[in-house]
Design a protein with these regions (language model features):
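Short histidine-centered beta-strand/loop micro-motifs
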Residues: 28, 46-52, 74, 93-95
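Ligand-binding loop in jelly-roll beta-barrel domains
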Residues: 86-109
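A short, N-terminal "cap"/entry segment at the start of jelly-roll beta-barrel domains
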Residues: 1-33
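Conserved short histidine dyad/triad with adjacent acidic residue
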Residues: 24, 35-52, 86
Length: 109
């Protein structure tokens, strides 16, 4: 088992993200295949359109975000989550000019 307290974690910068900082709570080195991050998005924060070979789940803890695919749009509010399959393109923006906090689960195949 791995237990991580609220303020614990390693600070990281995510590629192709802007106006965001975060803490890696659990890494693949600890769990074998899963990384868990807590991301703090500023009011103008988000992520550029990209894809990844890894599965991802975004869970909105605070605020509101929009996750866009090439032909779809998902508005997520507190308590909502989205699953992103390997290879799916997506971008993300923060809504309403207010910060958002997102718990991110990344699973390596």
């Amino acid at each position: 088992m791995i237990s991580v307290k609220d303020a614990q974690g390693t600070q990281y910068e995510a590629a192709k993200h802007f106006e965001v900082y975060g803490l890696q709570k659990i890494t693949e080195a600890q769990s074998q295949r899963t990384t868990v991050c807590y991301s703090y998005f500023q009011p103008n924060g988000g992520a550029e359109m990209s894809s990844s070979p890894k599965e991802r789940v975004y869970y909105v803890v605070k605020g509101s975000i929009t996750v866009n695919g090439p032909e779809e749009k998902h508005v997520l509010n507190e308590g909502d989550l989205i699953y992103i399959a390997p290879g799916e393109e997506r971008d993300m923006v923060v809504n309403n000019g207010k910060p958002a906090e997102v718990l991110v689960f990344i699973v390596t195949p």
